[in-house]
């Protein structure tokens, strides 16, 4: 992965969380945030000038906050709506990331977001993968970008 891709992932992810979910990243990722396990995730595959997938993983407190902020809801939100809200965030984030990677040049096709099984989460990085962790008052999120080699 090129350094320019690495540079673009964090600011693009942070801006998407801010603009779509109204969650504002912490200045520094704390030890407490890093210790929080991921309890939910979505994966969005894409193809076009570059192909791969983007994963968004989140700790327990993040998804209710995303859902409440995106839907303007107060209090407990249906688990299916939480899954849908995280999927929509993953979809928008994927679109923003692929556009930033290619400076808006080219057409990309995104597959629908798919829920991920937390039992399958790994902290190990794969070849051609970039990963950023983002801390929030509500917990932390992780964005992982996998590019296919072709």
Q: Predicted segment positions?
A:
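N-terminal auxiliary interaction/assembly segments of multi-subunit proteins
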Residues: 1-150
